[in-house]
Amino acid sequence: MSTHESADQAGTPQYGTAHSAASAAPHYSAAFGATSLPGSQPVSAQEYDAVLRRLSAAEATRDNMSRQIRGAGEKNRKLVEAITSMRYQVERLRASLSQNVMPPLNSAIVLAVHEGQTMTYEQVADDKTPAEIDTYLDVQVSGRMMRIPVSPLIDLSTLTPGMTVLLNDKTEAVLALDTEPFGDVVTVREVLDEQRVLVDTSSGAQQVARVAGSLNIEQLRTGDAVTLDTRTRMLTSQVPASRSQELVLEEIPDVTYEQIGGLGAQIEQIRDAVELPYLHPEIFERYHLAPPKGILLYGPPGNGKTMIAKAVANSLAARAAALNPGSATRGYFLNIKGPELLDKFVGETERQIRDIFVAAREKAEAGHPVVVFFDEMESLFRMRGSGRSSDIETTIVPQLLAEIDGVESLQNVIVIGATNREDLIDAAVMRPGRLDLKIRINRPDAAGAAEIFGLYLTEDLPLDATEVAAAGSTRAALTAMIAAAAGQLYARTPSTAYAVATVDSSMVVGSGASANLSTHTLYRGDFASGAVIRNIVDRAKKAAIKEQLQALTAGADASSVGIGTRHLLEAVRAEFEDQVDLPPLPDIEDALTVAGVRGRLVSVEPPR
């Protein structure tokens, strides 16, 4: 070993393993001892080692304190969570203890509210008692009537009859609750005064009930459904309109006479019977002629009976608005579908009929023209004693008769019935004075069918460009298409035969023949109707749309594609040939009657 190496080893301090790992400072050397500030004493190895040890100890102390601070912070967080949880538990225990200590609160229903005043000497001299002068509530508690004081914390202006209040152990009202909208459903019969209403219960009995403050008595009308609290005999709330009431509150439709085709003569009859008495009532009074109270529209289905009734209502509303400019006069169309009124409970259908006419009278008294329209009239008012039903009509028919007779004093109500089986309606309904005017809505003839076709085939539809060019104009093309479709529909050729009926004319009253069978061929036109014509037009439109889509798929020019004669003729064929079954017997009998054939229908067969 050299002298230099020995000197280095002798001058270099030897530290333990822990110290070497803890300190990253360089070892002391002679060169470091010689590099000192000018004028200062050189640092010895012992002093340098002492400084390093102090630094190492300080770092260890700092790390230890950091660990202690982190531990203290974690303990503090857990302590805060524990205190919060304990506080929540204490609050729960306190609330539970308060509930256990507080006595239960009884409930009472307010019957009357009296806002009192301070007693005066004059009132004492008049032998008045605090029960008469002070603020109090008349309530019902467990079936007993009581007069109780009111806590000053309750605002008396918020208390109304019918509300529920809570009572403390001193029987003092301390908390006000809302009115309970529950109870038996009853019907308003008559409003007696500002506080009393006569109602009909479900058992048929009548009761006089008081009205809760939450119910506006001025809005109550005869026939309204309300809830009755049987404990206090108080009406608490109004029940929304029932299904039958919603049916009769339909406003005026927008159908006009111009939208009905092929029924010009029938429409003229109806307008003369309905509109003239309304427009010129003074002339009818001079002649002592009462306007008709009812109209019966009968005939095969699908020929516009419902549309006529709607047009009557619309026309009356327009006339009323013209006669009373600036007023709020409007028309109402009460559309009643017969089967929807039938109910399994006895008396329920009759009640709904009463509701209908109550609504009609209310609107009429306000000056509004009202049309009460009974569709499928035979379903409700069948002939009594016919044995064709469960005899439910024995009470329904008299109810309608009473209501129609009650409309006599009203000037703005007219009843319109529609049926395709007038032979099933009770004769008392059909007699003059109830349904005065009876109009048969026949199937359209060829001219009427062309008029109906014109309502559905308009100039704004896309038409076949070839046919438009050949006709010279859109209007001319439409006229040609309609003529072709109507001609095909009413053609009487073997290809358009629809049914063959065998009739025994010997069954005619007065005929002495034993048997006289005859066959009659019925054609497509014998079963045409407005609904059938609309279906034909719809089929033609679908065929034109399909043809246009095929042209677009093939990449061809589809601008010239539109409804053409070929589509209409194919639609006429498909409308009847796609029906596998023969027409129903009532339709066949009706077609034979129109053709003047009388007798008993023996059989019906498809044409050969």
Curated annotation (Swiss-Prot):
Coiled coil: 45-79
GO terms under biological process: modification-dependent protein catabolic process; proteasomal protein catabolic process
Sorted UniProt keywords: ATP-binding, Coiled coil, Nucleotide-binding
Highest taxon of source: Bacteria
Binding site for ATP: G302, N303, G304, K305, T306, M307
InterPro entries: AAA+_ATPase (IPR003593), AAA_ATPase_domain (IPR050168), ATPase_AAA_core (IPR003959), ATPase_AAA_CS (IPR003960), NA-bd_OB-fold (IPR012340), P-loop_NTPase (IPR027417), Prot_ATP_ID_OB_2nd (IPR032501), Prot_ATP_ID_OB_N (IPR041626)
One GO location term (cellular component): proteasome complex
PROSITE patterns xrefs: AAA
GO MF, one example: ATP hydrolysis activity
Residue stretches spanning the membrane: none
Family assignment from sequence similarity: Belongs to the AAA ATPase family.
PANTHER family according to UniProt: AAA-FAMILY ATPASE (PTHR23077), PROTEASOME-ASSOCIATED ATPASE (PTHR23077:SF144)
Quaternary structure and interacting proteins, as annotated: Homohexamer. Assembles into a hexameric ring structure.
Name recorded for this polypeptide: AAA ATPase forming ring-shaped complexes
Organism for this UniProt entry: Rothia mucilaginosa (strain DY-18)
